[in-house]
Each structure stands twice: as C-alpha cells, then as structure tokens.
Amino acid sequence: IIYEHFGFTPSTNKETYATRSFNVGGNVDGKNILSNNPDVVVDFMTTAGTDSPDQFAFTNQPNHLVFFLYSLFKDDQELRQNFLDFCRVQCFAQEQAISEERQRTKRIFQDRAKDMYQKDIKPKFRDLLDNCPVISGQDILPQSVLGNSKNKERYKVAITYHLQNLYRSAGLVDDLEYPKTQSELASKILLPIEPTLLDMPLSNAEKKVKDFLDRSPHDVTVADIVRQFAKVPYGWADCCSIYVVNELVRRHLYAYNYNNNPNVNREDVARNIVRDASRFTIEPAKAISQDILNAFIEAWKHIFNVVSIK
C-alpha cells in the first residue's frame, strides 16, 4: 500500500534537496523496508507507546520523518480486526495443505481475504496515509504546509519539509555561483585571482568553513571538510564544499599542502583535488608582505588596463 500510494520504492530511495541527493530509508513499525545506510528515515507507525503525536515527537530522532497512523488506526476497530484477519489468512496460506479439501479451504479464505483487502483494508489505509499527523524530527507538520495534498504529492511535500527542517544551512551554497559538477569546479579553481577578492567580506558559507578550520585542533584535509559539511545541518554537495575551501585559499587565508608539497599550483589543484581530497591538507597561509601585494596589484592593473582598483 505504501509503495503504491506514495511511490516509495527501492528504485526511488533518493531525494534531491538544494545541492545534493540524500539516501532515504524506510521503516514500518520499526521493521526496515528500504535502504540500510540512509541520510533520512521515513517511518510508518501503526502502533506506538502513545497515541499523542506531540508526545511521540518529543522523543523522535531528528532525521526521522514519521507518518503517525496510530492515532487514527487505533480508533478504527473494524479496520484493525479486518487487517488482523487478513494477516492470519496470509499465515494460514503459507502452511502446507495436507489434503485436497484443505487446499480448497485455503483458496476460499485467500479469495475472501483478497476481496476484503481490495474493498476495505486498502482504501482505509490510503485514507490514513492522507490524513494522519506527520512528524519531522520533533516538529509536527502544520496543516498549512500539508494543505489538501494526497498520495505522492503529500509524500513529496512532507519529505521536502523534512529535508529543509534538517539541513537548514543547505541554502548557503545553493546559488549559481557554486559549481554543480567537477568540470565546473575545475574551471573556477583555474580562474585568475582578482585583487578585489582579498578585501571582499566572507560569504556565510566561507565563514562556516573558516570557523571549523580555526577550531580544529589537528590538521584538516579537504576530505574532512567534505565529510563535515555533508552532515546535518549543512548537506552540501562535495563540489560546493571544495569550492568554498578553495575560495578561502584564493583569499590567501589558507594554503594547500598536497602530498607534503606546500607549493601547489592551480593546475594541480584543479586536476587532483576531487580524486585526492584526503591528500590535500589545509594550512594557515603565510603572510604576504605589503610590497608583494602592491606589486601584484600594479601588475594586474597593467595586464587588464585598469586605472584603479576600488
């Protein structure tokens, strides 16, 4: 029912939000039905220790999106009994028939159960899925968000809200400035450094990465940055995280050390940084003298025929 109603299948267990896709896992009453290593988990609960969505939300894990069917399911005695009978028939059908008469009996029960499933159980469960409370972490989705959405649309609205709620800093790199592919990243790494960049304020994404680097008690590699900013609350794509690091290097706040070589040119960075992220260590940059900066600015003005730099 869940697979059909929400389009929730192993072949569609990824959801894209901001700059990357996330693995989606699924549980029915704690039993895994989808993905073993998920970023987010969708739970369908027909039983729980409380029938209060608010109380259940209080102990819910942050990355879990819950369709809390129990608060409605527990009050529908007819559905509960029919579902129990249906499950019993399925168990009975698995038993080996010891006679032709018993086999006929099994077929009769199976046909009745199939009819009950199609006419009663399935429609009512679909209705529960479309009307039950939905919980994202410790927040109950407001009706203003869910609206009158049904079926796959309701699931899409809920999972999008959940990803927004969980990865609240994903939008920091969801902009045209940031590369979407490795080739775009390489092109941006190879761009010449304009002198004005050194005086421009840091972006919010750059501030986050710089703060992480400044607080780290040990050497940090580009791979460490990628892992850290793929986590909650960021959820950044690898290319975006590497781009932010590289912008801090271009500002001369940090420098790369590649395979114990501190003198790394842009071409080597562009060619190798994605593949060898664990071999690129990020170190504080050495101070540049004012004379060198002035000479660089004068050379840049001469090359590009610029009279002054504001």
Each PLM stretch: what is its role?
Residues 1-310:
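Extended alpha-helical interface modules used as scaffolds for assembling large macromolecular complexes
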